[in-house]
Amino acid sequence: MFPHKKNDPLKSLPISRVGSSQRLNQHISSIPSTPNYVASSLNPVRNLPVSSGSIKSKITTKAALDKFEQLPIVKQVGAFEDTLNAISDNISQFKEGQLHANVEKIIAINDDLKSKIEELDRHRRLGENIKELEAESSNLDNTSKYILKELISYRNELRALPRLPASASKGSGDTVEIEDILKYAMKLAKFTKAPATSASMPFQIHPNNYVWPAEDALRRGMLAASSLNPDEIIANELGTTEEEKIQEKKDEQVKKADKQQDTGIRRGSFGDYGSSSSGKKKEEQSAQLDLDLFDSEDEFSD
């Protein structure tokens, strides 16, 4: 058996506002506590803003943590905490000598932190811009990859199409003058016609309705013009020059003159037996040929 405990009249007992039975039946989760939206000095962690970055921190390794602690603003925050703890110790221990120095130190750290917080805000905005640019860059990368994939698929489809057989004999590459081509085309144009398929094409003008003469008319005209000067055509085909033609004409004229002289000499040697009769015949022929069908005096005779 436990010994009986005597009541101490000098000891005060806690007074509860809730009955004992109600306290025993109360669930642990229903204990009243400070709400999340109310700032509490007893729980300063609740004063921090809750965001996706704080819930899932990017610091996952010891090296990342050391790098984070080496930042200047983090060092100043640590110094601010240490100074604040020193001030609280001075107040609790009534050390007035160090209190004034610690207060001045914490004020200087606070002013420096204000300027750094403004820079931190600027860096935060820059970080948001960097994230937007990274997202845009990733979208552009995805779009470029999609375009490249489509181009590769189109290239494969084009390569799968049948190809024309490669010509075994390629052109020698010799250049041909335009004048030679035009001359050859003019020669072919005299003896060629339009293909038969062009006659059945819609809105096709018949060759007979052209402004210029048809091919048959051109050929007939060329044949008629060539029949008037056969000697020149033969000379052109044989390749004789103009000097040779002139020389041949001179030779022919000389031969004709020699023949006329020979005939006159021969007639004079045999005598002028038939001169009177030939003169009469010439006069009769000239009289018969000199027919003046238009007489100007007949108009005024009436």
Curated annotation (Swiss-Prot):
Biased composition (Basic and acidic residues): 242-265
Gene Ontology BP terms: regulation of transcription by RNA polymerase II
Parts forming coiled coils: 98-145
Region spans: Disordered: 239-302
Protein keywords: Activator, Coiled coil, Nucleus, Transcription, Transcription regulation
InterPro entries: Mediator_Med4 (IPR019258)
PANTHER family documented for this protein: MEDIATOR OF RNA POLYMERASE II TRANSCRIPTION SUBUNIT 4
Family in the record: Belongs to the Mediator complex subunit 4 family.
Identification of the protein by name: Mediator of RNA polymerase II transcription subunit 4
Record organism: Scheffersomyces stipitis (strain ATCC 58785 / CBS 6054 / NBRC 10063 / NRRL Y-11545)
